[in-house]
């Protein structure tokens, strides 16, 4: 399944990308898509069988499932 995670800080995005790659998943940092908003403007796109909560940094803002150009909110740290 494909996901995109947004973050409160750029460092959090970097740490999450590294943790996901270390766990063997495909991950890449990128600018946040226009349809989404985030504090730092950087996101991580990744492919994994589930959210991989253990790899997400504590400053993760939101995680969305990605289906083409559509995003479905799965996790919101503000709630």
Describe the role of every protein-language-model region.
Residues 48-79:
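C-terminal structural segments of small proteins and small subunits
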Residues 1-47:
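Amphipathic, hydrophobic secondary-structure cores in small proteins
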């Amino acid at each position: 399944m494909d996901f995109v995670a947004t973050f409160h800080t750029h460092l959090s995005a970097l740490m999450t990308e590294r943790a996901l790659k270390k766990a063997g998943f495909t991950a890449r940092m990128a600018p946040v898509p226009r349809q989404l908003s985030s504090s730092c403007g950087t996101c991580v796109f990744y492919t994994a069988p589930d959210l991989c909560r253990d790899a997400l940094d504590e400053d993760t803002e939101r995680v969305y499932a990605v289906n083409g150009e559509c995003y479905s909110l799965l996790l919101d740290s503000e709630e």
